[in-house]
Design a protein with these regions (language model features):
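Short linker/helix segments within small regulatory modules
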Residues: 20-31, 116-124
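Short, intrinsically disordered terminal segments enriched in charged and Pro/Gly residues
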Residues: 1-10, 19-24, 28, 38-85
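Short cysteine-rich clusters marking metal-coordination/redox-active sites
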Residues: 11-14, 32-35
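Short, low-complexity, polar/charged sequence segments that are solvent-exposed and flexible
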Residues: 30, 38-39, 51, 118-120, ...
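Short loop/turn positions at the edges of beta-strands in beta-sheet-rich folds
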Residues: 24, 35, 105-107
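Long, distal/terminal scaffolding or interaction modules
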Residues: 56-136
Length: 136
């Protein structure tokens, strides 16, 4: 077994770390494979961090949900635009893209929420708010 330490990148959206890939460097724009967020890489004293590339914009949430759906193989239905509108409203009111169908505004409910990232779509066919759907 190798003693080489694998660098990991901290994602401020899903609060998880993912593996640093060869060819990436400070300033690289990468997509978190866990939540789909576009991140700009930054090296800190504690390791690698991804800063949100388009924080607070409609582009940020649209890119995130599109990337997440592509990564997981999910699809959207006709309520997508209503949910994006709800996510924008949550950002304006509470400071982040919290699930518009949940009353709690905590980090684990940033879209895509932790239950969705944890397999709700696979188990139930869709996420809590109906944004992400399992392909049939």
């Amino acid at each position: 077994m190798s003693d080489t330490k694998v660098d990991r990148i901290y994602c401020p959206v899903c609060l998880a770390k993912f593996k640093f890939s060869e060819g990436w460097s400070e300033g690289s724009v990468v997509v978190c494979p866990i939540c789909g967020e576009r991140l700009i890489l930054r090296k800190t004293a504690d390791g690698w961090v991804g800063d949100r590339a388009d924080k607070g914009t409609e582009k940020e949430i649209r890119d995130r949900i599109e990337s997440f759906a592509e990564i997981r193989g999910y699809v959207f239905n006709d309520v997508k635009e209503d949910i994006v509108e709800g996510l924008m409203g949550k950002y304006k009111r509470f400071g982040d893209f919290y699930c518009p169908c949940r009353m709690e505004h905590v980090p684990e409910y940033q879209c895509p929420c932790k239950p969705t990232r944890g397999g709700d779509v696979e188990r139930n066919g869709k996420c809590h708010c109906g944004l992400f759907w399992k392909k049939v």
